[in-house]
Protein backbone atom coordinates (compact mmCIF):
# COMPACT_ATOMS: atom_id res chain seq x y z
CA UNK A 1 0.00 0.00 0.00
CA UNK A 2 0.95 3.64 -0.22
CA UNK A 3 1.14 3.82 3.57
CA UNK A 4 3.53 0.85 3.67
CA UNK A 5 5.76 2.46 1.04
CA UNK A 6 5.98 5.71 3.03
CA UNK A 7 6.70 3.87 6.29
CA UNK A 8 9.46 1.84 4.59
CA UNK A 9 10.94 5.01 3.17
CA UNK A 10 11.01 6.68 6.59
CA UNK A 11 12.87 3.66 7.99
CA UNK A 12 15.44 3.86 5.17
CA UNK A 13 15.95 7.56 5.84
CA UNK A 14 16.57 6.90 9.54
CA UNK A 15 19.07 4.16 8.71
CA UNK A 16 20.92 6.52 6.37
CA UNK A 17 20.92 9.35 8.92
CA UNK A 18 22.01 7.24 11.89
CA UNK A 19 24.59 4.99 10.24
CA UNK A 20 28.08 6.53 10.01
CA UNK A 21 28.79 4.43 6.91
CA UNK A 22 26.20 6.45 5.02
CA UNK A 23 27.45 9.81 3.92
CA UNK A 24 25.61 12.24 1.70
CA UNK A 25 27.71 11.10 -1.29
CA UNK A 26 26.96 7.44 -0.62
CA UNK A 27 25.34 5.89 -3.71
CA UNK A 28 22.67 4.12 -1.66
CA UNK A 29 21.62 7.42 -0.10
CA UNK A 30 21.63 9.19 -3.46
CA UNK A 31 19.60 6.38 -5.01
CA UNK A 32 17.16 6.72 -2.14
CA UNK A 33 16.80 10.43 -2.87
CA UNK A 34 16.16 9.75 -6.55
CA UNK A 35 13.53 7.09 -5.85
CA UNK A 36 11.98 8.83 -2.86
CA UNK A 37 8.21 9.13 -2.72
CA UNK A 38 8.44 11.98 -0.24
CA UNK A 39 11.09 13.95 -2.10
CA UNK A 40 9.05 14.00 -5.30
CA UNK A 41 6.31 15.87 -3.48
CA UNK A 42 8.60 18.78 -2.61
CA UNK A 43 7.62 20.74 -5.70
CA UNK A 44 9.35 23.97 -4.71
CA UNK A 45 12.81 22.45 -5.19
CA UNK A 46 12.00 21.22 -8.69
CA UNK A 47 10.40 24.51 -9.71
CA UNK A 48 13.35 26.52 -8.34
CA UNK A 49 15.70 24.37 -10.43
CA UNK A 50 13.66 25.13 -13.56
CA UNK A 51 13.57 28.83 -12.66
CA UNK A 52 17.32 28.96 -13.12
CA UNK A 53 16.60 28.64 -16.84
CA UNK A 54 13.16 30.19 -17.26
CA UNK A 55 11.54 33.29 -15.82
CA UNK A 56 8.64 33.05 -13.42
CA UNK A 57 6.34 34.46 -16.10
CA UNK A 58 7.08 31.47 -18.31
CA UNK A 59 5.33 29.14 -15.86
CA UNK A 60 1.64 28.47 -15.46
CA UNK A 61 1.05 26.40 -12.36
CA UNK A 62 -2.50 25.33 -11.67
CA UNK A 63 -3.84 22.71 -9.27
CA UNK A 64 -5.48 19.65 -10.79
CA UNK A 65 -8.50 20.05 -8.53
CA UNK A 66 -9.39 23.13 -10.59
CA UNK A 67 -9.29 20.95 -13.70
CA UNK A 68 -11.62 18.46 -12.05
CA UNK A 69 -13.99 21.07 -10.58
CA UNK A 70 -14.32 23.50 -13.48
CA UNK A 71 -12.72 22.17 -16.65
CA UNK A 72 -13.88 25.03 -18.92
CA UNK A 73 -12.53 27.74 -16.61
CA UNK A 74 -9.28 25.82 -16.17
CA UNK A 75 -8.78 25.38 -19.91
CA UNK A 76 -9.60 29.05 -20.53
CA UNK A 77 -6.77 29.98 -18.15
CA UNK A 78 -4.42 27.71 -20.09
CA UNK A 79 -5.51 29.05 -23.49
CA UNK A 80 -5.25 32.66 -22.30
CA UNK A 81 -1.79 32.01 -20.87
CA UNK A 82 -0.66 30.47 -24.16
CA UNK A 83 -2.32 33.32 -26.06
CA UNK A 84 -4.27 30.91 -28.23
CA UNK A 85 -7.94 30.95 -29.17
CA UNK A 86 -10.22 29.41 -26.60
CA UNK A 87 -11.94 26.33 -27.97
CA UNK A 88 -14.05 23.56 -26.55
CA UNK A 89 -12.44 20.18 -26.15
CA UNK A 90 -15.15 17.65 -26.91
CA UNK A 91 -13.82 14.46 -25.35
CA UNK A 92 -13.22 15.45 -21.75
CA UNK A 93 -14.16 12.21 -20.04
CA UNK A 94 -11.56 10.99 -17.61
CA UNK A 95 -9.66 8.01 -18.99
CA UNK A 96 -8.19 5.02 -17.16
CA UNK A 97 -9.57 6.15 -13.82
CA UNK A 98 -8.34 3.92 -11.02
CA UNK A 99 -9.89 2.97 -7.73
CA UNK A 100 -7.92 4.08 -4.70
CA UNK A 101 -8.36 3.23 -1.07
CA UNK A 102 -9.03 6.31 1.07
CA UNK A 103 -5.86 7.51 2.77
CA UNK A 104 -5.63 6.70 6.46
CA UNK A 105 -6.24 9.82 8.63
CA UNK A 106 -2.96 9.48 10.52
CA UNK A 107 -1.00 9.10 7.26
CA UNK A 108 -2.77 12.13 5.80
CA UNK A 109 -1.88 14.17 8.90
CA UNK A 110 1.73 13.00 8.64
CA UNK A 111 1.92 14.03 4.97
CA UNK A 112 0.27 17.42 5.58
CA UNK A 113 2.73 18.10 8.43
CA UNK A 114 5.70 16.80 6.45
CA UNK A 115 5.00 18.95 3.40
CA UNK A 116 3.82 22.09 5.26
CA UNK A 117 7.21 23.90 5.39
CA UNK A 118 7.99 22.95 1.79
CA UNK A 119 4.55 24.05 0.60
CA UNK A 120 4.91 27.35 2.46
CA UNK A 121 8.14 27.95 0.52
CA UNK A 122 6.30 27.05 -2.68
CA UNK A 123 3.38 29.38 -1.95
CA UNK A 124 5.80 32.20 -1.21
CA UNK A 125 7.73 31.57 -4.42
CA UNK A 126 4.59 31.41 -6.55
CA UNK A 127 2.74 34.11 -4.59
CA UNK A 128 -0.16 31.70 -4.69
CA UNK A 129 -1.73 29.37 -2.14
CA UNK A 130 -3.22 25.93 -2.78
CA UNK A 131 -5.64 24.24 -0.38
CA UNK A 132 -3.72 20.99 -0.19
CA UNK A 133 -4.09 20.58 3.56
CA UNK A 134 -7.89 20.41 3.42
Residue ranges of predicted features:
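The conserved 3'-phosphoadenosine-5'-phosphosulfate
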Residues: 38, 48-121, 127, 131-134
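PAPS-dependent sulfotransferase catalytic domain
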Residues: 1-66, 70-73, 77
Amino acid sequence: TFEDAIKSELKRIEICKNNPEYKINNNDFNNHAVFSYLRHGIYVDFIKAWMKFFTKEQFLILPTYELNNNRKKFLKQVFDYLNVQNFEIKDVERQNVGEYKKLDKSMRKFLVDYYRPHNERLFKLLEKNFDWDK
